[in-house]
Curated annotation (Swiss-Prot):
Feature: compositional bias, Low complexity: 1-28, 61-76, 368-381
Protein name per the record: Serum response factor
Statement: the UniProt record of this protein carries the keyword DNA-binding: yes
CDD domains: MADS_SRF_like (cd00266)
C-alpha cells in the first residue's frame, strides 16, 4: 500500500468514527493524502480530496502576506492596547489558528476547511489568538513611547492612574511606609495620594505653591544631570539627602502598660513657694528643621471640690489626696476627659524623670481660699515617656497620644483619632493676652495675673522631632470668665531619679 493510500485509509477510519458514514471511500490521489503541519512538524491524516496541498499553500501564503498579523492579532486599530505585539506572540497566534483550521479540515471536510481558510471558522466569534470564549488578548507588551492617538492616550491615562494609586495604597498599607504620589494630567488636573505624615506637602500653602510653580514652569530641555535620568527611570532614585530617623517605639509598638507614672496630690497649708526649683531661663523648643518656638502657657482648670479620698477620672488617671494637716479648702487638678497623661503606645520622645508641680495661687476675689495646693507627679521608673508630643511645625504625625502645640494665647491639643474630622481643642483661651504671657520664672503676685508654665529639660531645651498638625476648625472650650475662677500654675522641673513614689 502506498503511503498516500495509507493516509487515506486512516482518514476513512476517522471520518467513519466521527460522521457515522460507513460507506465513504477514499478518493485521494498520490501525493495529496498526507498533509504536513508546518508549525509542529508532524504529519496529520489526509482527507483524500487534495486538501493537504491546499493547506500547505495557505500556510506559505499566510507567512508571506504582510497582513497576516491583522488576521491573527485580534486587536482593533483604535483599541487601548492596539500597539504591536512581540514577534513571538504573533507566531503563537498564527500557530494556534492554523491548528484550529486543520481540525476543521479533518472533522468537517472540504466545506469546513474552506470556511476556516476564509476566516469564518469555529473561532470567528472570539478574538483570534486568544483562548476560545475569551474576548481580549490578555497581557501584551507595548512600546514605551508617547501615544499619539488622543482617545487611546486618555484611556490609558485613566486606567494606569487608577492602577498606580491602588499600588501606592497597597504599599503604604502592607508595609507601613509613607507614600506621596502626585499625578498631573495633560488636561490640568492634579491627582494625589499621600499618607498622613506627607499630607502637608500637598495641603499646606507652601506645598501648593511649590507644586503649582513646578507645573506651570515650561518644560526644561533634557540636561546632562545623571540623577535626573535616574529619577525618571522605572525603579526611581533613592534620595540620599532626605533620610530620616525612625524611632524604635514607632516600630516596636510598645503597650501602654510599660510605664505607669504615679499621681499624688498633697494638700499643704500655707504658701509653698519654696519648692519652685525651675531655672529662671526661658524654655524653647528646638525643631530640627525650623526656628525655635517658645512654649506658651498651658493652664489647667482646678475643681473647687475637696476630695480627701482617691478620685479616678474617666481615662483611668488616679488622683490620690492625702492631707498633712487641717485644710480649710483645697483643689484637685481636673483633667479633661479626652486628655491622658499616661504613656501611649507610639511616642517620639523620651525625657528623664520629671515632676509636675501645680501651684494654686490664692485669689483675692475669693477670700475663703487661703491655702495653696501642690500637685506632684513622679514616676516609678527611670524615664517618663510623654504621650503628648508638643508640635510646632506643620507636618502631621501618627504618634499615639495627643498632639499639643502653642498658640499666642493658649495651648491647643487634639487626639490623633480626632484629626480626621477636624476636631481640635483650645485649653483656656483668653479674649486678650495676659500681661505675663512670656515664659519665665517670674512668680505672679499681682491680682488678675495668670500663672505660667515652665518646661525644663536637663540642658534647658527640649529636642522635639519634626512633626505638627493641620490647622482645622477649632472648638474653644474652657473659656475663663469672672474673677472667682481658679487658675493653676503648671511647672515641669527636673528631679533626681530618687523620686520614685509609687501609686498604690
Amino acid at each position: 500500500m502506498l503511503p498516500s493510500q495509507a493516509g487515506a485509509a486512516a482518514a476513512l477510519g476517522r471520518g467513519s468514527a466521527l460522521g457515522g458514514n460507513l460507506n465513504r471511500t477514499p478518493t485521494g490521489r498520490p501525493g495529496g493524502g498526507g498533509g504536513t503541519r508546518g508549525a509542529n512538524g508532524g504529519r496529520v491524516p489526509g482527507n483524500g480530496a487534495g486538501l493537504g496541498q491546499s493547506r500547505l499553500e495557505r500556510e506559505a501564503a499566510a507567512a508571506a502576506a504582510p497582513t497576516a498579523g491583522a488576521l491573527y492579532s485580534g486587536s482593533e486599530g483604535d483599541s487601548e492596547s492596539g500597539e504591536e505585539e512581540e514577534l513571538g506572540a504573533e507566531r503563537r497566534g498564527l500557530k494556534r489558528s492554523l491548528s484550529e483550521m486543520e481540525l476543521g479540515v479533518v472533522v468537517g471536510g472540504p466545506e469546513a476547511a474552506a470556511a476556516a481558510a476564509g476566516g469564518y471558522g469555529p473561532v470567528s466569534g472570539a478574538v483570534s489568538g486568544a483562548k476560545p470564549g475569551k474576548k481580549t488578548r490578555g497581557r501584551v507588551k507595548i512600546k514605551m513611547e508617547f501615544i499619539d492617538n488622543k482617545l487611546r492616550r486618555y484611556t490609558t491615562f485613566s486606567k494606569r492612574k487608577t492602577g498606580i494609586m491602588k499600588k501606592a495604597y497597597e504599599l503604604s498599607t502592607l508595609t507601613g511606609t509613607q507614600v506621596l504620589l502626585l499625578v498631573a494630567s495633560e488636561t490640568g488636573h492634579v491627582y494625589t495620594f499621600a499618607t498622613r505624615k506627607l499630607q502637608p506637602m500637598i495641603t499646606s500653602e507652601t506645598g501648593k505653591a511649590l507644586i503649582q510653580t513646578c507645573l506651570n514652569s515650561p518644560d526644561s530641555p533634557p540636561r546632562s544631570d545623571p540623577t535626573t535620568d535616574q529619577r525618571m527611570s522605572a525603579t526611581g532614585f533613592e534620595e540620599p539627602d532626605l533620610t530620616y530617623q525612625v524611632s524604635e517605639s514607632d516600630s516596636s509598638g510598645e503597650t501602654k502598660d510599660t510605664l505607669k507614672p504615679a499621681f499624688t496630690v498633697t494638700n499643704l497649708p500655707g504658701t509653698t513657694s519654696t519648692i519652685q526649683t525651675a531655672p529662671s531661663t526661658s524654655t524653647t523648643m528646638q525643631v530640627s528643621s525650623g526656628p525655635s518656638f517658645p512654649i506658651t502657657n498651658y493652664l489647667a482648670p482646678v475643681s473647687a471640690s475637696v476630695s480627701p479620698s482617691a478620685v479616678s477620672s474617666a481615662n483611668g488617671t488616679v488622683l490620690k489626696s492625702t492631707g498633712s494637716g487641717p485644710v480649710s479648702s483645697g483643689g484637685l487638678m481636673q483633667l479633661p476627659t479626652s486628655f491622658t497623661l499616661m504613656p501611649g503606645g507610639a511616642v517620639a520622645q523620651q525625657v528623664p524623670v520629671q515632676a509636675i508641680h501645680v501651684h494654686q495661687a490664692p485669689q483675692q476675689a475669693s477670700p475663703s481660699r487661703d491655702s495653696s495646693t501642690d500637685l506632684t507627679q513622679t514616676s516609678s521608673s527611670g524615664t517618663v515617656t510623654l504621650p503628648a508630643t508638643i508640635m510646632t511645625s506643620s507636618v502631621p504625625t501618627t504618634v499615639g497620644g495627643h498632639m499639643m502645640y502653642p498658640s499666642p494665647h493658649a495651648v491647643m491639643y487634639a487626639p490623633t483619632s480626632g484629626l480626621a474630622d477636624g476636631s481640635l481643642t483650645v485649653l483656656n483661651a483668653f479674649s486678650q493676652a495676659p500681661s505675663t504671657m512670656q515664659v519665665s520664672h517670674s512668680q505672679v503676685q499681682e491680682p488678675g495675673g495668670v500663672p505660667q508654665v515652665f518646661l525644663t529639660a536637663p540642658s534647658g531645651t527640649v529636642q522635639i522631632p519634626v512633626s505638627a498638625v493641620q490647622l482645622h476648625q477649632m472648638a474653644v472650650i474652657g473659656q475663663q470668665a469672672g474673677s472667682s475662677s481658679n487658675l493653676t500654675e503648671l511647672q515641669v522641673v527636673n528631679l533626681d531619679a530618687t523620686h520614685s513614689t509609687k501609686s498604690e
